[in-house]
From Swiss-Prot:
Forms part of the ribosomal stalk which helps the ribosome interact with GTP-bound translation factors. One of its GO terms (molecular function) is large ribosomal subunit rRNA binding. It comes from Methanocella arvoryzae (strain DSM 22066 / NBRC 105507 / MRE50). PANTHER family: 60S RIBOSOMAL PROTEIN L12 (PTHR11661), LARGE RIBOSOMAL SUBUNIT PROTEIN UL11M (PTHR11661:SF1). It comes from the Archaea. InterPro entries: Ribosomal_uL11, Ribosomal_uL11_C, Ribosomal_uL11_C_sf, Ribosomal_uL11_N, Ribosomal_uL11_N_sf. The keyword Ribonucleoprotein applies. Part of the ribosomal stalk of the 50S ribosomal subunit. Interacts with L10 and the large rRNA to form the base of the stalk. L10 forms an elongated spine to which L12 dimers bind in a sequential fashion forming a multimeric L10(L12)X complex. GO terms for biological process: translation. CDD domains: Ribosomal_L11. This is Large ribosomal subunit protein uL11. It holds the Pfam family Ribosomal_L11_N. The keyword Transferase does not apply.
Length: 158
């Protein structure tokens, strides 16, 4: 029977302290090796919180699976911001370009329920609503209406 430990760690900066150490300690594996592998696999997500799954089998071998950061973290990293707006409906903190929205959608594509790039970009726009981020200088809901009307079909074709 394999034990599974799921944690959120800073990309490329996991350490043996909480939350990893206390969760992995009782399993009897080399925590330093696990931390090194996590840091190696998450170095591309530097500055973002990344979901990580450590699977330990009965013979104390482990595998590390790295998820993608939340969509909100990817949007904020594209804009080089720390956090979203406290009042997202009235105070907008930045604006994504359509290209940035497509990039975020493609990074999250495997974890999304959307079948098409167009719908994936609309999911990203939905996240932008709660963050107080505009897209192409427009409120996210206006942007979604334009996407539905086909304005960006040339960029959203697969």
């Amino acid at each position: 029977m394999a034990d599974v430990v799921e944690v959120l760690v800073p990309g490329g900066k996991a350490n043996p302290g909480p939350p990893l150490g206390p969760a992995l300690g009782p399993l009897g594996i080399n925590i330093k090796k696990v931390v090194d592998e996590i840091n190696n696999k998450t170095k591309d997500y530097n500055g973002m919180t990344v979901p990580v799954k450590v699977i330990v089998d009965a013979s104390r071998n482990f595998t590390v699976e790295v998820g993608t950061p939340p969509t909100s973290a990817l949007v904020l990293s594209e804009l080089k911001l720390e956090k979203g707006s406290g009042t997202p409906n009235t105070n907008f903190i930045g604006s994504l370009t359509i290209e940035q929205a497509i990039k975020v959608a493609q990074m999250k594509r495997d974890a999304m329920l959307s079948y098409t790039l167009k719908n994936a970009v609309k999911e990203v726009a939905g996240t932008c609503v709660s963050l107080g981020v505009m897209i192409e200088g427009k409120k996210p809901k206006e942007f979604i209406a334009e996407v539905n009307a086909g304005k960006y079909d040339d960029k959203l074709s697969e």
